Amino acid sequence: TAPHIDALKKATPKGSAAHPYNLANQTNGGAKVENTANCYVVNAPGYYSFPMVYGNAIKNGATNTSAYKTKATGTVLNTLYNHFGPITDPYITNNANCNIKSAELVWQDAKNLITDIRYVDKGMNGGYVSFKVSKSTIRPGNAVIAVKRPEGTILWSWHIWVTHDDLYKTTEITNAKGKKFNVSPLNLGWCGGDIYYYRSRSCLVKFTAGGESKIMTVRQLPARFQPGYSPYYQYGRKDPFQPSDGTNAIKTWYNKDGVPSTAYPTVKNLGSGDNLIKNCILNPNTFASSNDNKYLNLWSINNGRPGINTPVVKTIYDPCPVGFKIPEGDAFTGFSQENSTWNSEFAEKHFYT
């Protein structure tokens, strides 16, 4: 097996079936909910769980109201929505019409990467979802898990990212204005593929000009190449879409029944405004074709005007794991000669990787 897969298989397993490792407890995986997110990172085999909390609505063990409420003015949604209406509490089951019955896989891009998914209605605040990552099948990959009401309505969904890489070995970058940012070494959801090694080679080349000749040695240095992939994101949404396989095609993914597919996500008009937000939550694997940009604060709660690089305050729709957030709009301006943002069109449909 490849080194990146070996590293995952050899990692010390976490949790047990009776006591799964709580991904929202960064101290020791215990029962206390410390920090939540829409994306949880797994780097070892084992049994895992996460609480029924909207995105990052719990921070440092307390309610993080700024993740879903704002008094900002402009083109903003002052209280962010769940599938039904404005959120009133960080814990899903403490909101109206949010009784959870089950949990299931939406998709995963590695066969049997995540198994034994179940909803456990235990303890306070709506219990938790647990799942297993087996040593025999662990490898870099992505999965989306959703919880449902009794009639099958999706209430919320989370991204599980399995990787051996250390996301917290950040790189410091500086934008055009001299502001510094610490960024992850990987795109969100990045998974490396098989590693290819190329040995050093050399050959003799003879040059002849007129009556003179000269033989030169051309040497090619050894090289290491690792292709990979990462999922795609639609503006303002928390859930990833299946990645490309490196060509103009979708990487093979598997549904809840283990059936493989290379089909693109469903594309559908999911409405506009408040209805668009609710329908995106209800349909995490449907790409919204409706060209609606009514609210500018879906990924930064206080952002009320286009083209203004206000400090990002992470929201419950942010797709990043604990410790990270969507960067400010001018974070990468130091990379371009013009020192401008990559796209300033207000009505564009954007993909993010």
What are these regions (language model features)?
Residues H4-T27, T36, A44, T73-K135, ...:
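Conserved positions within compact, well-structured domain cores
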Residues T36-A37, V53:
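Structured alpha/beta or helical-core interaction and ligand-binding surfaces enriched in interleaved
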Residues V42, Y48-M52, I160:
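Generic detection of short hydrophobic beta-strand segments and adjacent strand-loop junctions
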Residues A57-I58:
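A short beta-turn/strand-edge loop motif at beta-sheet boundaries
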Residues T65-Y68, Y81:
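Terminal domain-start segments
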Residues E151-L155:
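Short acidic/polar inter-strand loop motif in beta-rich domains
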